[in-house]
Amino acid sequence: SWVLGFQQQPYYGYGTAGSIPSEVEGEAIYIEQYRRYIYRTLFGGIYYPTSRFQRFELGLEGTLVDEDVLEYFQPYELASGFPTDVLRSRTVDVASYSYAMPTLAWVFDNALYGYVGPFLGRRSRFEVGQSIGTWQFFQGTADYRRYDKVAGPVVLATRLFYFGRRGRDAELFQFYGGTTELVRGHTYGSYEKNECLVGGALNACAVNNLIGSQSAVGNVELRWPLWNSVLAGLPLPFAGLETAVFFDAGLVWDNDSNIKWNRDEDDPFIDPSQFDPALGGPEVRNVVRSWGASLRGNLLGFLPLRLDYSRPLGRPMVKHY
């Protein structure tokens, strides 16, 4: 079998902000800049099954990237701070980049599924790719999952996961590793509200600990069904209910990061040399951990839903999330 497709994805990042003098006396202009990358990708692939449960995948993608800066101008009165004109904007073209990347993957899947997920078997995917063109980097993925019955309907689900990029331009593709699909209890919002208001510039916000170009994650879950004869008699719109307790651990780092299991109080979240070369030393990345409980259900037989309650470890300012 084969696949062929096209996708376009915009990515936005904060730029600079500040005020500049205006030609009108008593006024200034407040400027905000946002950096935007638009990825346009044409991709294709061939799937070659070698058995009922495993296959090889050969893919090729070509990507064109347009980089520009979005600028917003707001004139305002110096004395009062009130706007004196409508907000205006412009787009400044910066550069264009292009690269192609062939990929090769081996996939195995013999898992048996229930209403809300697998309950027996294993799944794995190992993939490598090398970009060719303006941006050059090596990309690798390793995802291994097991589902083992412990006793009766109780299932132990485990996962080991790695994704990363290395090479000359790998640092251009940084990502955030605190999503609910990787390490629960460490979403971006939980840091922004609690831990980005303390420390100086060299300490930065703790959210930087989960930003990088490589990630390694381990998840352990103990799952069991809640659907029984009592619940079956209630008019609930769920085809199945399942609960679980879990433990997550993960690490996100860059090519030059200093990796630790536990962080010291004075370890920097960002490279201090970008403020003062004399400070030297890379940023420190440490393993983040969390535990919690989860409730899952299949709404109307076709829409799986999940509710997680997690307690991040090593974050005294956040008790649960």
Give a label for each model feature.
Residues 5-11, 16-35, 42-45, 64, ...:
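C-terminal outer-membrane beta-barrel translocator/porin domains of Gram-negative envelope proteins
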Residues 34-37, 41, 48-55, 60:
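Surface-exposed, low-complexity/disordered segments
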Residues 54-56, 64-69:
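Charge-patterned, long linear interaction tracts outside catalytic cores
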Residues 55-59, 155-157, 304:
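Membrane-spanning beta-strand positions in outer-membrane beta-barrel proteins
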Residues 244-246, 303-310:
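Conserved active-site loop/cleft motifs that coordinate metal ions or position small ligands
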Residues 290-296:
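Short glycine-rich, acidic/polar surface loops and turns
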